[in-house]
Regions:
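Generic recognition of short, well-ordered alpha-helical interface segments
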Residues: 9, 13, 106, 174-177, ...
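Conserved catalytic-core subdomain
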Residues: 226-308
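Conserved alpha/beta enzyme-core scaffolds, especially Rossmann-like or related mixed alpha/beta domains
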Residues: 1-33, 40-66, 216, 255-281
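Active-site cores that bind ATP or allylic diphosphates and position pyrophosphate for catalysis
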Residues: 33, 40, 49-54, 64-231, ...
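Alpha-helix boundary/capping residues
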Residues: 18-25, 74, 183-186, 246, ...
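Alpha-helix initiation and N-capping motif
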Residues: 8, 64, 79, 83, ...
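A general structural signal for well-ordered secondary-structure junctions
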Residues: 24, 53-58, 76-80, 92, ...
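Short coil/turn segments at secondary-structure boundaries
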Residues: 62, 83, 292-296
Length: 308
């Protein structure tokens, strides 16, 4: 997401809009879907029709230890499905919840997810289906320290900036279903781009956020020789370090194109520098989806290619 200090007011506005919705007010986008993202659909279960008392955004007083003790972690992408403790508290003891808020008890804010399956097409991994309540649960949209969550921030950023081609890592496939849900709720709540003087002009010719066709693609991850994912939190090698050591744009683009399979089978080819125009000229999703396994970086070959 865009650096939070410069977008804090926009994220706050988005959360305030969502907070004005009750759970039953978004039942139409749950049961019939919304055309803001044509490659996806929703299928609602029975729970959505019986959750009228549940606010869409609600406070959560649980600690991380509480959640770990009551939840079963999901495999692969580190998702832990929230057990719904405070959602039940809001429904069964609303006055107790209000009193805790009045006492300034530390709390985060969560979005209530529905008994709903969201289906979308991914350019690399094909048709994806996730049940919001079972596979994802009610996730935090604002932490107890006031920081807005990644899930809310990227959804707001994409909607605000009119992004129509969403490309992330394959570990965020499950998150994409949640972001579709949040996006639909934001549109229902009347969210508007922060800079209306810059018209929304998606490539497909539509002119409103709820008309636009969105393309989703999730790419294989890059692992080191030990099988650990390269990530900022692990202080993995990044573009700043590469450019500081003299790596050229053509070298970097060529290496990325090679990793994506645009220069042939990774086992039988070596990366070759190329320009952005050259990479675009050979790009196709068919080539990328030929090999959807995570890539393992050979540090010696990597260093030799970049002259490190």
């Amino acid at each position: 997401p865009v650096f939070q200090s410069s977008r804090h007011a926009l994220y706050q506005e988005a959360l305030e809009l969502l907070s004005k919705l009750s759970f039953d007010e978004i039942s139409d986008i749950i049961s019939t879907g919304s055309n803001d993202s044509k490659p996806c659909s929703t299928t609602a279960g029975n729970e959505a029709a019986t959750s009228e008392a549940t606010p869409l955004i609600y406070p959560c007083f649980c600690s991380r230890a509480d959640i770990r003790a009551a939840s079963a972690p999901q495999e692969g992408d580190r998702f832990t499905v929230y057990p719904g403790t405070c959602r039940r508290l809001i429904a069964s003891e609303p006055q107790r919840a209000k009193q805790r808020l009045a006492n300034n008890d530390r709390h985060s804010m969560r979005i209530a997810t529905a008994d709903t399956t969201i289906t979308f097409h991914d350019e690399v991994f094909g048709t994806q289906q996730y049940h919001l309540a079972h596979d994802i649960g009610d996730i935090i949209v604002r932490r107890s320290d006031g920081i807005y969550s990644y899930q809310l921030a990227v959804t707001v950023d994409d909607l605000d900036m009119g992004i129509t081609d969403i490309v992330r890592g394959r570990d965020l496939l499950r998150s994409n279903a949640l972001q579709i849900y949040i996006r639909k709720a934001l549109i229902k709540a009347g969210f508007k781009p922060s800079e209306p003087t810059q018209p929304f002009h998606p490539a497909d010719g539509s002119n409103k956020p709820d008309d636009v066709t969105i393309s989703y693609a999730h790419l294989p991850l890059i692992d080191n020789a030990a099988g650990q994912r390269l990530a900022k939190r692990e202080r993995s090698l990044d573009l700043g370090i590469l450019t500081a050591h003299g790596a050229t744009a053509q070298q970097i683009i060529g290496y990325c194109a090679w990793l994506l399979g645009l220069q042939g089978d990774l086992k039988h080819t070596k990366p070759q520098p190329m320009s952005a125009d050259e990479a675009l000229g050979v790009f196709s999703w068919d080539a990328v989806r030929t090999n959807t396994s995570d890539r393992t970086l050979d540090q010696g070959e990597f260093n030799a290619y970049f002259g490190l």
